[in-house]
Amino acid sequence: MAESYKQSGVDIHAGYEAVERMKKHVNKTMRKEVLGGLGSFGAAFDLSQLNMKAPVLVSGTDGVGTKLRLAIDSDRHDTIGIDAVAMCVNDILTTGAMPLYFLDYLALNKVDPVIVEQIVKGVADGCAESECALIGGETAEMGDMYHTGDYDIAGFAVGAVEKDAYITGERIAEGDVILGLASSGIHSNGYSLVRKIIKDNNLDLDAEFDNGKTLLDVVLEPTRLYVKSAKAILDAADVHGMCHVTGGGFIENVPRVFVTDGLYPEIDVTNIPRQKIFDLLQEKGSIDKMEMYNIFNMGIGFIFIVPREAVEKVRSAVNEEVFEIGRVVRGDKAIDIKGV
C-alpha cells in the first residue's frame, strides 16, 4: 500500500510514525477546555469553561525566520518549536490576552519521524510553559518545494481577555514609566544578518563564547516566553501598554503601542543590561550603534508601560530584575533613544 505515493516523494507511513511519536508531547499541553483529541478534522475549545464575562479572542501568527537555517545546518531541532510558540504568544500578550491554544504548521522536504518529534516536542514545551494547549497542526511533506533536509515552521495562537481589560495603549499618559524584562538573547529576529556576520567573519560556532556556552548555543537560545511574568504583573499592577520587542527592534516596535497623538517613548539605553552577543554582532558586522536598536531587542524582550505609582507593584510581582528603561513624554517624535 502507498508505494506509488512514496515513489512520488510522500511517505505516509513515516507520517503515521511521526504522529504517534508526537502524541505524548502534545498530550502534556492539554487543558480541560479542549474537546476531542489529536487527529480530528477540526480542533475544538470550550470557551464557556473559562467563566469569563465578556471574552475577547486575540489571535496571532508568526514563524521563526532564518534562525531555522542555523538549526537545520547544526542538526539541532529540539528548541526551534519553542521559538515558534514564543513569537506568537508574546505578541498576543501585549493586549492582555492569555494564550488558550496553539496550532502549528510544519512543511518539510521529507518526513523524518525522529526530527519531526524533536520539533514538535519544542512546540509542546513552549505551549506547556505558556499554559496553552497544542490543539492541532499540519505536517506537510513537499519534496518538490524544499531542499533536502529543509523545513519551515509557523504557529498560530489564540488567547482571551475580558473586554474591559483589553489593552489598546489608549491609556498611556505623559509621565508613565517604561519598564523592561530581559530577553534570552537574540530571540528570533535579525538572523539573516546574524548568519551573514557569522559567515563573513568565519566565526567558530563551536567555540566557547559566554558562561560555558558555545556561540551556537547562544545564537540558538530559544526566544523567552513572557506569559507567566506578564500574568503576574497584570494581576498586580495597572498596565497602560505592553510591547513585544521583535523584528525592527525598539525603533519600530515601541511606537506601535502609542496610539494617542502627541506622546512618544523616551528610552535610556544605559539602563538596559548588556549582552555579549549584541556587542559581538555590532563589532563584527560594523553596524551603527543606533541601527542595532532598529534590528535587535538589545537585551530587553518585553516592555510594560505603567503609571509611576505602579512601578514597585511591578517589581514585587516577579522574581527577576525589572529594568526602568524610559518614560512617556509629550512631543511629535516617534521615539527618542538616548545613551547610545
From Swiss-Prot:
Q: Which InterPro entries match?
A: PurM-like_C_dom, PurM-like_C_sf, PurM-like_N, PurM-like_N_sf, PurM_cligase
The molecular function terms of the Gene Ontology recorded here are: ATP binding; phosphoribosylamine-glycine ligase activity; phosphoribosylformylglycinamidine cyclo-ligase activity
- Could you list this entry's UniProt keywords, alphabetically sorted: ATP-binding, Cytoplasm, Ligase, Nucleotide-binding, Purine biosynthesis
- Enzyme Commission number(s): 6.3.3.1
Entry's localization field: Cytoplasm
Catalytic activity from the UniProt record = 2-formamido-N(1)-(5-O-phospho-beta-D-ribosyl)acetamidine + ATP = 5-amino-1-(5-phospho-beta-D-ribosyl)imidazole + ADP + phosphate + H(+)
Q: Which family does it belong to?
A: Belongs to the AIR synthase family.
Protein's UniProt name: Phosphoribosylformylglycinamidine cyclo-ligase
Species the sequence originates in: Macrococcus caseolyticus (strain JCSC5402) (Macrococcoides caseolyticum)
Which gene carries the instructions for this protein? Answer: purM
